[in-house]
């Protein structure tokens, strides 16, 4: 008799074996739905790569809690460029009963549906089939037709087919028809049909167990004038091979070919493939794309497309030989010698005026004196007593010990003052006050005289010459530049007194004021170029006694020195230029009228669709880039020189470079349909096809617009583009003619202010239309003349549903 414990163990083992026998073993195969996202909540979400996400789904594990069982029927995956922020969303079978109403297009996601197939074949890729809804292979390309109970049997038969290579199937969900073919959308894309029959549902599945990278073999050959790339395909291929950034000008479209090639010329030979060839070090790198996803337009790059890099050395680049090395060393020595000579010359110029005496009179009108700025400090063991005797008047001042903090104020904006004095028969005497510094600490009186420490440099010259020498301020050496002017612009302003504030920063030293009188016996014209920086310094001093005997005007010694120069009462002509004139301020013409000023936004850039400004469109939509000057000048004076489109925050590195759509006033064939620039009402426009990048829907258009101020811009002769109006660059008729505008301005001259011109220009001679044309068009064109870089952003979505979602929520 058996032991009861043994019977119990045998019973448990039998039940365990029976339960394992009844559990069906799933051989997981995934069907990919590209660019699809399910818009309902998943049962679990985790940050896993696609391989980890599919592994958890195949094993029936929870991706969040490894080891915990979770039934999985499909996953929605979003790949992240950084390799860490992936998104894996898991769905169970009961959630997939009816997914047709919950599928939305999203380039960021891919949906993978898991099928348990009885096939024993193993696929090396991440998925076995690619799904296309409501499509099927043409009956002429179908080799085998059977009836199956479900989709799983049809997929399994395609994987296990031995008589031919099953590249695709078309499964009829209504009658169970399984149509197998040896062609695919790569070999015969034109054979794929769209199902428009509402009586049955049929879908297309392409077999991806054939590795695409093994199906194509790339080779390239480096030539003197370009790079030749050849491709061999295991199966007949139909598609396109093209340069990454030059689809429209640099491509070949083979039709059911097994061997094909394309020649990519260098930039020095042709510009057709110039954007796809980059220089990296001593090599030229060509980036080639082979379209394998079957998605049109073919220039829309997807991760399924194959990319190939061909590298060739730059012709003419050789290693340095001894002769080249010797010449390079000789050139370096020459450069060093020139630098040393320049430094010696600059040092000599900076020391030129140290030992020269101060010249008080100028006997010749062409004498030019340049003073070198030096700060001189003398330290002795004597008290500081400064005496300047001109008359018998003596003033004694005792300064108490102040205790204040140093305060320094610096004005960075340069001020240039030019003073022109008319000829006077009498000699002119101009007193000038300069400041020097002396430091002392003993008792015997002594007088110390130094050169002026004025931080300004001046040049006095004759009025008969038209050449002005302007000496700029520099801390190490004097630098002179020569300018010639024929017609200087002047403005008459009566300036009886000119006051200039200067200061010298001196640590713990008193100041001494020296009055110097300069007498010019002959009539002269003085032009002074001054660059001033206002600085105020307050220092702490000991009680000192300063004795000064001067004539009026007198200057009291203090830390801050103010110098006042009184000019003769004779009429003067002064031209003052302070910085650059403001662009928004109107200038004054010779006749007193106000000229049109340059506005803050000279060219207005808008994007239109069907005559309405837009900020979001569907990819492939025809839009118009409109450029309108601020003033209503004729469109012949507006020219679009160049345009490019670039993504906003793309995820892939190859998407960062902008694509040109207009170059030198003509289409650049960068991407999509681009028409030549045309004239529009008061401006220009460019009709293009909205382009979208793979990882971002936000793009930016940047264009260079030229306003020709004096004559109509030269016309550009561009080749005709299919899909564009051949009669481009024509001018539209204005709704309001120039005659109507002229009559309105003559009736009410105050309306002229709306054009940025003076109403007095029409009040003087309102009967002449020539005056109107010259004032309105010429002044406004001159005000707007130049090149302007304008930018505009646009959101490009994939479908009308996404566009409605964006309009409703504001999110992409």
Curated annotation (Swiss-Prot):
The gene is let-653. SUPFAM superfamilies: Hairpin loop containing domain-like. PANTHER family: FI18240P1-RELATED, PROTEIN LET-653. It holds the Pfam family PAN_1. This is Protein let-653. Residues 1-21 form the signal peptide. Disulfide bonds join 26-116, 53-88, 57-72, 123-209, 154-178, 158-166. GO terms for cellular component: cytoplasmic side of apical plasma membrane; external side of apical plasma membrane; extracellular space; supramolecular fiber. SMART domains: PAN_AP, ZP. Residues 221-725 form the ZP domain. The keyword Transferase does not apply. GO terms for biological process: anatomical structure morphogenesis; cuticle pattern formation; embryonic ectodermal digestive tract morphogenesis; epithelial cell development; negative regulation of tube lumen cavitation; positive regulation of epithelial tube formation; positive regulation of multicellular organism growth; positive regulation of nematode larval development. CDD domains: PAN_AP_HGF. Disruption phenotype: Lethal at the larval stage of development. Defects in the development of the excretory system during embryogenesis and the early stages of larval development. Dilated lumens of both the excretory canal cell and excretory duct which become apparent between the early and mid 3-fold stages of embryogenesis and increases in severity as development progresses. Lumen dialation may be as a result of fluid accumulation due to blockage of the lumen. At around the time of hatching, the autocellular junction, which usually seals the excretory pore tube, is absent. Glycans are attached at residues 172, 211, 272, 771. Keywords: Cell membrane, Cleavage on pair of basic residues, Developmental protein, Disulfide bond, Glycoprotein, Membrane, Secreted, Signal. GO terms for molecular function: structural constituent of cuticle. Residues 26-116, 123-209 form the Apple domain. Required for epithelial tube development and shaping. Involved in the morphogenesis and function of the three unicellular tubes of the excretory system, the canal cell, the duct cell and the pore cell. Also plays a role in cuticle development, alae formation and shaping of the vulval lumen. Required for larval development. Residues 375-449, 496-584 have a biased composition (Low complexity).
